[in-house]
């Protein structure tokens, strides 16, 4: 295999910024974990836009730059749309959110935890009711 090199950042001349061509899976997961905390579309979209911008421009450790962002202006000017167009896997954030909120995942998690969830019920039935064990 050929030696792998870190991909070069892409310059977006319209906004004078450089962005990574791809988000890392861990970054997508962090965005997803924050998005699912919110219930309204606007809060979710703002979280996706800002966090994608922060990770794509690699300013995650620069709190002063993050605090200086003017979300509404950036949104009106199309900064977030341009970044999503440039970062090839930005759409994976929406897939991650859909997966995290899927019924199949919820059922799988319930099934995994069902024995633990039933223990208190078994104890109550043993003390106060009738429990048939097979």
Q: Where are the regions that the model predicts?
A:
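N-terminal "first-domain core" detector
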Residues: 1-40
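Short, surface-exposed, charged amphipathic helix/loop patches that serve as local interaction elements
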Residues: 25-134
């Amino acid at each position: 295999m050929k030696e792998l090199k870190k991909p070069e950042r892409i310059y977006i001349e319209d906004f004078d910024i450089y962005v990574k061509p791809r988000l890392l899976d861990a970054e997508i997961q962090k965005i997803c974990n924050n998005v699912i905390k919110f219930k309204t579309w606007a809060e979710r979209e703002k979280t996706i836009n800002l966090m994608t911008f922060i990770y794509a421009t690699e300013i995650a450790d620069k709190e002063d730059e993050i605090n200086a962002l003017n979300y509404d202006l950036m949104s009106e000017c199309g900064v977030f749309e341009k970044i999503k167009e440039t970062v090839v896997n930005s759409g994976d954030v929406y897939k991650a959110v859909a997966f995290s909120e899927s019924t199949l995942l919820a059922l799988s998690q319930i099934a995994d935890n069902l024995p633990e969830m039933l223990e208190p019920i078994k104890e109550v039935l043993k003390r106060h009711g009738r429990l048939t064990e097979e």
